[in-house]
Amino acid sequence: MESQQDFPHFLPGQEDGDSQRWGRGKRIGIIGGRGQMGRLFGRFFEAQGYQVVIADHDAGEGNEEIIRISDLVLFAVPLHETVSIIRDLIPYTRPEQLLMDLSSLKVGPIQEMLRSPSSIVGLHPMFGGSISSFAGQTMVACPARIDSREWSTMRQLFENQGMRIKECTPEKHDYMMSIIQVLFHVTTMVTGRVLRELAVDVAETMEFTSPSYRLEMNLLGRIFAQNPALYSAITQMNPFTRDVLDHLEAGLKRYKEWYNADDLSAFVSDFKRSAEHLGDFCGLAFEESSALLDFSVELARTRTEDRNQKTEGGNEKAEMRR
């Protein structure tokens, strides 16, 4: 999966290249520059002294023009459109350019960008476009074809703003995303489906809630409050999704068998085996999540008090009108 043949990383024989080729003052073209991530990174590069130009459906230059006039090109387009947009623009790319993308998957976009004569770095910010600071945020980087000194300069640009850069191959990235994103997104979406099919009144369940249930429901609601096309594409387009779904299906089938057989010991044994696999993380997670639960309870209490005060205020105004 991570052979040097599959992942060229640094171009051989280019160690003496000009590390300022894509430095401050250069022009970066952002395709998809009006989207949330496009705007975020547009502000980032502008603050670092770059000339930022954008292309989008309803603003800026055309995609081909952006490629023609830019020293660096950043693809910040919807995941399900990334590969086709890159493919259409490959004929306009040049050897002296740097191409980057921000998509949630890396194998497909990087394979397509490698068809160009340009230098290539795939990026995946592990955060959304609404953050207030880059400090402490993680961004995965796949420097697929680039001079080592030039990549070091670009990496430092991100790290100077507090980002943590994790390097890996495109294949390793997509495998890890099948766990970090696909596994947990699918289980969350299935939970939402079950709540819908059982016609569960979520507000009513909150009257019976435990702190952990409230926190889990907040995370579930957070997913469903976002773009369904993105979450669907992350699941559908990851090359490792099938394996994750197969294991989920097998696990649910096994749990159903144990339930039908009234085999409590099988549940207990399986629980213990998973806990052993997770090891010390269980204790650390318990401690960290306990702090989150305390905060969640306090937040819920404050919100309830605020709602009660608003209700009382409304009742007082109604009485005065009488």
Write out the residue ranges for each language-model feature.
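NAD(P)+-binding Rossmann beta1-loop-alpha1 motif at the extreme N-terminus of oxidoreductases
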Residues: E2-E65
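Short, basic, low-complexity termini and linkers enriched in Ser/Thr/Gly/Pro
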Residues: E2-Q5, H9, R301-R322
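Rossmann-like NAD(P)-binding element
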Residues: E65-I90
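ADP-ribose/adenylate-binding Rossmann-like module
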Residues: T93-G108
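Rossmann-fold dinucleotide-binding core
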Residues: L105-K106, E112-M177
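Active-site-proximal catalytic alpha-helix in oxidoreductases
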Residues: H173-V202, M206-A225
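Interdomain hinge/lid region at the active-site interface
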Residues: E204-A285
